[in-house]
UniProtKB/Swiss-Prot annotation:
PANTHER family: CHARGED MULTIVESICULAR BODY PROTEIN. One of its GO terms (cellular component) is multivesicular body. Keywords: Endosome, Isopeptide bond, Membrane, Protein transport, Transport, Ubl conjugation. GO terms for biological process: ATP export; endosome transport via multivesicular body sorting pathway; intralumenal vesicle formation; late endosome to vacuole transport; protein transport; ubiquitin-dependent protein catabolic process via the multivesicular body sorting pathway. It is a peripheral membrane protein. This is Vacuolar protein-sorting-associated protein 24. The keyword ATP-binding does not apply. Belongs to the SNF7 family. Core component of the ESCRT-III complex (endosomal sorting required for transport complex III). ESCRT-III appears to be sequentially assembled as a flat lattice on the endosome membrane and forms a transient 450 kDa complex that contains DID4, oligomerized SNF7, VPS20 and VPS24. SNF7 oligomerization into a membrane-associated filament is nucleated by association of SNF7 with VPS20; the process is terminated through association of VPS24, possibly by capping the SNF7 filament. VPS24 subsequently associates with DID4/VPS2. Interacts with the VPS4. Interacts with DID2. Disulfide bonds: none annotated. It comes from Saccharomyces cerevisiae (strain ATCC 204508 / S288c) (Baker's yeast). GO terms for molecular function: identical protein binding.
Length: 224
């Protein structure tokens, strides 16, 4: 019976509203989960940088700094997406409250742009496509955008020099923090201690590479 009603009269508006809100909540949970996981990665990477800085291992500090830069960039992207999702939610709620939907919704083009921007994020792609379908059924948007994946691969693509500059800032931050009181430290005693605790370069490099690969895998998992 419900199937016949839907075939004749179209989807029930209240049911569509529930579905839309459910998809919005799902997207919100996905973003919050990604932000929490990225925060854990940030903290872990910062600790690794500090540990390497204490050993005066600038090479490893720079290696971890590059990873921290990528993590920070992804975090900023997700944080911005959370604000965009809130904007989408408010516009949809306003349309539902006023019961105007597509016929009188003046900002549907702006809404489509924001939805399309969120679809470009791999973390939200599936659920945002689901939202687009529900919005089409409700008439809030007239069509799905075809070029949703056009810039997924190059979002935030930057010049190497700009990346190096940001990485250098991170390196300077932690190395300056390490050596800001260097005048107060007896140079001879420091050298003696370092000789006693010296670790083979091969082991340091292997450990650094292992940690970097682990962080990259976790970041890749978050992105996909």
């Amino acid at each position: 019976m419900d199937y016949i009603k839907k075939a004749i009269w179209g989807p029930d508006p209240k049911e569509q509203q529930r579905r839309i809100r459910s998809v919005l909540r799902k997207n919100g949970r996905n973003i919050e989960k990604s932000l929490r996981e990225l925060t854990v990665l940030q903290n872990k990477t910062q600790q690794l940088i500090k540990k390497s800085a204490k050993k005066n291992d600038v090479r490893t500090v720079r290696l971890y700094a590059k990873e921290l830069y990528q993590i920070n960039k992804q975090y900023d992207r997700m944080y911005t997406s959370r604000a965009q999702l809130d904007s989408v939610r408010m516009k949809i709620d306003e349309a539902i409250r006023m019961n105007t939907l597509s016929n009188q919704m003046a900002d549907s083009a702006g809404l489509m742009r924001e939805v399309n921007s969120l679809v470009r994020l791999p973390q939200l792609r599936n659920t945002m496509i689901e939202l687009e379908k529900e919005l089409m059924k409700s008439g809030i948007i007239s069509e799905m955008v075809d070029d949703t994946m056009e810039s997924v691969g190059d979002v935030g693509e930057e010049m190497d020099e700009a990346v190096d500059e940001e990485v250098n800032k991170i390196v300077e931050q932690y190395t300056n923090e390490k050596f800001k009181n260097v005048d107060q430290v007896p140079t001879v005693e420091l050298a003696a201690n370092e000789e006693e605790q010296e670790i083979p370069d091969e082991k340091v490099d292997e450990e650094a590479d292992r940690m970097v690969n682990e962080m990259r895998e976790r970041l890749r998992a978050l992105q996909n």
